[in-house]
Design a protein with these regions (language model features):
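Periplasmic-binding protein-like
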Residues: 55, 134-142, 205, 209-250, ...
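C-terminal motif of bacterial Sec signal peptides marking the signal peptidase cleavage site
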Residues: 16-19
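Extended ligand-binding regions for polar small-molecule ligands
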Residues: 21, 30-34, 75-83, 163-165, ...
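Short glycine-rich His-centered loop
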Residues: 48-71
């Protein structure tokens, strides 16, 4: 009996040990995802607003004799920087061409495009536009001595455009049979016209008025190529926060008639006496066709 007892006790003890579970290891708390910084906070942390502008398209964006960016669009961008960051100098300008405006937004090279970009259905699919700040129509510039009198005369001529502009898109869609000569930069297109490589240059009318005013011997055809359309700043598709901030800024600036000040400084001198500023600028972002 004693032998049996001695054998049973260890076996019973082993069975107890086998039935015991190891203490459960404490579960690690799930990491709480850090909330993504807002886009405006990202700009503030960076300390500067990055804006795509033209460098050769007066009166909107150009480089002056001091090597500084100036113009209607660039001054508006500086005001944005001042109101967002407290200092208009906290801005970085990136030179863009018409065809690079959208890619620069999509690749995050810039926060904002302020480069005379006309709002079109095709562009709306690629970027988000804010409320408009300007209105524009496409017209054509020809030498004073040119036999071209109307837009219809261009059907038998060579029309110069800058790649990616509204004029380029409009002619491609509406007159695919016209002979069109394309250049990447506005300055290259104007030089090509001066050199006689084409008969006319189709571009936003305010740009052409500026050129004709400074360069005697050219005239702008009175007819428009297409309808009048809004021009607006643009942000990357989906950047609702920055878009809404710009809309609020445009509304606030409208109360102080800020765009009228820029119009008087950069645009008025290029237009005929008596031109209504509201035919060019859109104060407060309120578009009225």
């Amino acid at each position: 009996v004693k032998v049996k007892t001695a054998l049973v006790v260890p076996l019973f003890a082993l069975s107890l040990l086998a039935g015991c579970d190891k203490p459960a290891e404490p579960k690690l708390a799930a990491a709480t995802p850090k909330p993504a910084a807002s886009y405006l906070e990202t700009i503030k942390a960076r300390g500067k607003l990055i804006v795509g502008v033209f460098s050769d398209k007066p009166p909107f964006g150009f480089v002056d004799e001091k090597g500084e960016y100036v113009g209607f669009d660039t001054d508006l961008a500086k005001r944005f920087a001042k109101d967002l960051l407290g200092d208009e100098k906290r801005i970085e300008f990136v030179s863009v061409e018409p065809a690079s405006r959208i890619p620069f937004l999509q690749s995050d090279k810039v926060d904002l495009i302020l480069a005379n970009m006309t709002v079109t259905p095709e562009r709306r699919e690629a970027v988000d536009f804010t409320n408009p700040n300007l209105r524009v129509a496409v017209q054509a510039l020809v030498p004073e001595a040119s036999p071209v009198k109307t837009v219809d005369d261009l059907a038998a001529k060579t029309t110069i455009v800058t790649t990616g502009t509204t004029a380029d898109l409009w002619l491609t869609k509406n007159h695919p049979d016209w002979k069109v000569l394309k250049f990447e930069k506005n300055s290259e297109s104007l030089q090509a016209l001066a050199n006689g490589r084409g008969d006319a240059y189709a571009q936003d009318n305010l740009v052409l008025f500026n050129w004709a005013k400074k360069n005697p011997g050219y005239r702008v055809l009175p007819q428009k190529l297409g309808e009048e359309a809004p021009i607006a700043p643009a942000v990357k598709k989906g950047n609702i926060e920055l878009r809404d901030w710009v809309n609020g800024e445009l509304a606030k600036l409208g109360e102080e008639k800020y765009l009228l000040k820029l119009y008087d400084q950069y645009v008025r001198k290029d237009l005929a006496d008596g031109t209504d500023p509201s035919s060019v600028i859109v104060e407060g972002g309120h578009w009225k066709p």
